[in-house]
C-alpha cells in the first residue's frame, strides 16, 4: 500500500502513518467541552496537512472513533489528510471507553494495518 515517490537519485517509498482521533462523546462532554474538542480538531487539520506535505516519507491517514454509550467509527476507513473533513460531534450517553478500545485494537493488528506502516498516533480526547 506504500506510494512510491520519484526523487533525484531514485524512488522513495512513502510509508503510511495512521492517526486516530478517539473522542469521548459521553454526557459529561456536553456543551462547551465537546465544542472545544470540535474547534480544536478543526483547527489542527490545516497544520496537519502542511506537516504531511512537508514530509514525503509518510502518508498521513486519519480516522476518527467516537465513544459514549457504545463506540463507532466516524471515519470508517483511513482518509488522506488532504481529503479529510471534520464533522462536529455531539455529546450524550455514558462513557464506554472499553468498547472504543476493542474497536481500535482490531484496527491496530497486522493486518489490517500493514507491517510497513509507521507507528500509529493515538489521540484520546476526554474530560
Predicted region positions:
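Acidic, polar low-complexity linker/tail segments
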Residues: 1-20, 25-35, 109-116
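Short N-terminal helix-initiation segments at or just after the protein's N-terminus
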Residues: 3-13, 61-72, 96, 100
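DG-centered beta-turn motif at the end of beta-strands
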Residues: 22-26, 37, 64, 104, ...
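A generic "cationic amphipathic patch" detector
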Residues: 49-50, 54-57, 77, 113, ...
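Short beta-strand-loop
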Residues: 57-88
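A broadly tuned preference for mixed-charge, low-complexity surface segments
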Residues: 69-78, 117-123, 127
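Von Willebrand factor
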Residues: 72, 83-119
Amino acid at each position: 500500500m506504500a506510494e512510491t515517490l520519484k526523487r533525484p537519485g531514485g524512488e522513495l517509498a512513502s510509508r503510511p502513518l495512521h492517526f486516530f482521533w478517539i473522542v469521548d462523546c459521553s454526557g459529561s462532554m456536553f456543551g462547551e467541552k465537546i465544542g472545544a474538542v470540535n474547534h480544536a480538531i478543526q483547527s489542527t487539520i490545516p497544520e496537519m496537512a502542511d506537516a504531511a506535505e512537508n514530509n514525503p516519507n509518510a502518508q498521513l491517514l486519519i480516522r476518527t472513533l467516537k465513544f459514549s454509550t457504545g463506540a463507532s467509527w466516524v471515519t470508517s476507513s483511513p482518509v488522506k489528510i488532504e481529503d479529510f473533513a471534520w464533522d462536529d460531534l455531539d455529546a450524550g450517553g455514558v462513557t464506554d471507553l472499553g468498547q472504543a478500545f476493542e474497536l481500535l485494537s482490531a484496527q491496530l493488528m497486522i493486518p489490517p494495518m500493514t507491517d510497513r506502516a509507521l507507528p500509529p498516533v493515538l489521540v484520546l480526547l476526554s474530560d
